[in-house]
Amino acid sequence: MATQRASGLLQRLAQGSLVKQILVGLVLGILLAWISKPVAEAVGLLGTLFVGALKAVAPVLVLMLVMASIANHQHGQKTNIRPILFLYLLGTFSAALAAVVFSFAFPSTLHLSSSAQDIVPPSGIVEVLRGLLMSMVSNPIDALLNANYIGILVWAVGLGFALRHGNETTKNLVNDMSNAVTFMVKLVIRFAPVGIFGLVSSTLATTGFSTLWGYAHLLVVLIGCMLLVALVVNPLLVFWKIRRNPYPLVFACLRESGVYAFFTRSSAANIPVNMALCEKLNLDRDTYSVSIPLGATINMAGAAITITVLTLAAVHTLGVPVDLPTALLLSVVASLCACGASGVAGGSLLLIPLACNMFGIPNDIAMQVVAVGFIIGVLQDSCETALNSSTDVLFTAAACQAEDERLANNALRS
C-alpha cells in the first residue's frame, strides 16, 4: 500500500505543472536562504548539477537534431530560417536603439573607483568577428566538449547534407538517436524545480542583494529597458509578422523559457528547454532545430542593451558629449558586438570596452565599467539571459506561425 502511494505521488509530480513546481522551488529556496545560509550554500550543489546536466546534453541535442532534420529533409519542403534570422538581427538592433533612448531619458552615472579586473577584452570588432569565423572551423569533438555551437552547427549541417545521400536505414538510425537524446532532455527538465531551488537558495546565501542597492538606478534603467523590449518592442515585431494579438505567445515564451533562463543564466543550458517548448507549440522541427541553437549564438537583445546602457552610463559620468548620429552608430556597434557575445569569455560585459572606444574612453576606465557590470551581474546576467533565450522561441514561433497561415490562405484561394 505504501509503495502504491509513493508511486502515485511520483506520478503526480512527473505529470504536474512544471511552472507551478518551479514557483514552489523558488519560494522554498528564498525561505531556506533566509533561515540558514550554510544549508542554503550546501544545497547549491543541486542547482550546479541541474545546470551541468543541461549544459552536458545541449551540445549533443543540437548536433543530433540538426543532423537528423537535414538528413531527413524532403525535397521542396520549406523552412523559415531566413525570416527568423532577419527577426533576430532586427530585434537585436531594436533593443540597442531602445537602450539608447532609455539611457538618454534616464541618464545613469557610475562610481568609477574600483580597480580594473585582471581580464583582457577583445581589441576590436574585427577580433570578435575573427573569433566567430574561427569557431566555425573547430574540430567537431572539440566543439562538442567546449559547447561551441557555431562549430556544432557547421558540422551538423555538413553531416546532415552528406547523409541525405545515405541509406534510409542510416537516416532512420540518426532520427532514432535524435529522439533518444530528446527523451533524455525531457528527463533532465523534469528536475528543474529541484535545480532552481538549489540555484536560488545558494545565490541569495552567497551574494545577497545588499551590494546592489548602490547601483539601484543603473539596474532600474537596465531591467526597465529589457522589460520594454520584452513587453513592447518584441510584441510589435511579432504582431508585424503574425498580424494578430502577440501577447499570448509572448507570455508563454516568457513563462516557459524566460523563467528557466533567468535562474540558469545560460543560453546554452536553455537550448533543451526552448526545443521542448517549440515541440509543445507544434512548430516545424526542421526549422526550430536550427533556429534555436543559432539564436543562442547570435540573438542577443539583452547583450545589446547591457553594452549600450553601461557604455552610455560611462559617457554620462565622464561628461562626454554625444550627438544623434553617434548614438545611432553606437546602436549598430552594440548590435554587432552582441551578436559576437557568445564567442567571448565573459560575454557582453567584456565587449563594453569596444563600445567605450567609440567615445575615446581609456581602457582602464572601460574596465572599471566592466567591474561594475560584474557587481550587478546577479540581476543583469539573469535578466539578459531570460530576454535573449525567450526571444529565440518567440521569433521562431512567429515566423513558423506566419508561414503556416500563409500556406493555409493560399490553399483556400486555390
UniProtKB/Swiss-Prot annotation:
Pfam families: SDF (PF00375). NCBIfam families: PRK13628.1 (NF010151). The chain crosses the membrane at residues 22-42, 46-66, 84-104, 143-163, 180-200, 219-239, 300-320, 332-352. The keyword Nucleus does not apply. This is Serine/threonine transporter SstT. GO terms for cellular component: plasma membrane. It catalyses: L-serine(in) + Na(+)(in) = L-serine(out) + Na(+)(out); L-threonine(in) + Na(+)(in) = L-threonine(out) + Na(+)(out). Belongs to the dicarboxylate/amino acid:cation symporter (DAACS) (TC 2.A.23) family. The lineage of its organism: Bacteria, Pseudomonadati, Pseudomonadota, Gammaproteobacteria, Enterobacterales. GO terms for molecular function: neutral L-amino acid:sodium symporter activity. Gene3D superfamilies: Sodium:dicarboxylate symporter. The keyword Transmembrane applies. It is a multi-pass membrane protein. GO terms for biological process: serine transport; threonine transport. Involved in the import of serine and threonine into the cell, with the concomitant import of sodium (symport system). Keywords: Amino-acid transport, Cell inner membrane, Cell membrane, Membrane, Symport, Transmembrane, Transmembrane helix, Transport. PROSITE patterns: NA_DICARBOXYL_SYMP_1 (PS00713). PANTHER family: PROTON/GLUTAMATE-ASPARTATE SYMPORTER (PTHR42865), SERINE_THREONINE TRANSPORTER SSTT (PTHR42865:SF8). It is found in: Cell inner membrane. It comes from the Bacteria. InterPro entries: Na-dicarboxylate_symporter, Na:dicarbo_symporter_sf, Ser_Thr_transp_SstT.
